[in-house]
A protein has these predicted regions:
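Active-site-adjacent structural elements that line small-molecule/cofactor binding pockets in enzymes
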Residues: 1-189
Length: 189
C-alpha cells in the first residue's frame, strides 16, 4: 500500500505474515439500529452490562438476529459478547469500595456528554460515588456471583468479558481464577 498523508508516508507497504483466516470484525452496539447492523455485517457483537434486561432481551439481541436474517445469515454464527462489570472480593466492603474508582459510570449520559476535562469529570463523579456500585455486579459470595454473571449467559450471550474496577488487578484475577471461573465453567461449560 502506498500512502501520502499529512504525517505518514508509505511506499508499497505490505504485511508479510498475513493471518490464515480473515480477521473477525466485532461491532459494538448500544441500541437496536447498530445491533441490526452488527447482525448484517459483523462476525461478532459487543455491548456492555448494567443497562437492564429489557435492552438486551427486547431490543439488542432481537435486532442482531433480524439483521443477520435480512442478510441471509444464520444468527447463531454471530458471537454475542458482553463486557460484564464485576466487583468480586472475599471482603464485601472492599468489593463495594472498588466500584468508587469508576464512579463516573453512575452519572447519566446527558451529564457527561459535554465534559472534556478529566478533572471536571472526576469532580462530578465524586457527587455520585456512593451510587457507583449500582452499575456493577458486586459480591463476596462465589455462588451468588456466578448466578449474577450466569444471567447474561441465560440471556443469550456467548462470550463474557470481565471488567473489574479495583486498583489491585492481580488480586482480582487471582480471586476470579480461583473462585468464579471454575464454577462458571462447571455450570455452563
Amino acid at each position: 500500500m502506498t500512502f501520502e498523508g499529512q504525517y505518514y508516508h508509505t511506499l508499497k507497504a505490505t504485511i508479510y505474515d498475513k493471518p490464515a483466516q480473515p480477521v473477525p470484525i466485532y461491532i459494538s452496539a448500544g441500541g437496536p439500529v447498530a445491533a441490526k447492523f452488527a447482525g448484517r455485517y459483523g462476525d461478532g457483537f459487543i455491548c456492555t452490562s448494567g443497562k437492564g434486561d429489557e435492552l438486551y432481551r427486547d431490543q439488542l439481541l432481537p435486532a442482531l438476529e433480524e439483521g443477520a436474517r435480512a442478510a441471509g445469515r444464520d444468527p447463531s454464527t454471530i458471537e454475542r459478547c458482553i463486557e460484564v462489570k464485576v466487583s468480586f472480593d472475599t471482603d464485601k466492603e472492599r468489593a463495594l469500595k472498588d466500584t468508587r474508582i469508576w464512579a463516573a459510570l453512575a452519572l447519566p449520559a446527558e451529564e457527561k456528554v459535554n465534559i472534556h476535562d478529566p478533572r471536571e469529570m472526576e469532580k462530578k463523579a465524586e457527587t455520585v460515588a456512593d451510587q457507583a456500585y449500582r452499575r456493577w455486579l458486586v459480591s463476596s459470595d462465589p455462588e451468588e456471583h456466578v448466578e449474577q454473571v450466569g444471567h447474561y449467559i441465560e440471556l443469550g450471550f456467548t462470550h463474557l468479558i470481565f471488567h473489574a474496577p479495583g486498583d489491585d488487578q492481580s488480586r482480582f484475577l487471582r480471586l476470579y481464577a480461583q473462585e468464579i471461573l471454575p464454577r462458571l465453567r462447571k455450570r455452563w461449560g
